[in-house]
Amino acid sequence: TKTLKNATKLNKGAKVFLHPVKNPKLYGIATIKNKKIINLKEKPLITKSNLAVTGLYFFDKQVVKLSKTLKPSKRKELEIVDLLNKYRKKNALKAEFLGRGGAWLDAGSIDDYYDTTSFVSTIEKRQGFKIACLEEIALNNGWINKVVLNESIKFYGNCEYAKYLKNLL
């Protein structure tokens, strides 16, 4: 989409994509004021916001350096929210909203995973197109040619995915 293509042009700072959710306690949540992220918290018990951090991020070249400064959280994990907060504190974090008409699905639990796979399967069957077929995206954008696509088809062998790719030729 145009929004994603614009995000790939990011030269400085970071960009995070947000989407409203019903149960903010299950996600990393952003609080926005005057179109700026003023707070980011992982799985907050109390929050005034319902804007989930979707897991779609764009970073500048500083991301590796900043990542190396992260410390494990109480959950003994390196948290993406901590990295995003480093950008926020430098006033270098931008937000983009995935609004109505788009689909963002979390697959953090077994039930969520089932719902996500069912959704993707239904859309693919009804429309006859794969969702996020990397070879198809690359071919359509001119990043690969049909020779490279043919190599992928050989790699995948005799499976449904390879048959789908053959139809792109």
Each language-model region and where it sits:
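Catalytic-core segments of class I nucleotidyltransferases/pyrophosphorylases
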Residues: T8, K36-E136, W143, V147, ...
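Short, amphipathic C-terminal "tail helix"
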Residues: W143-L169
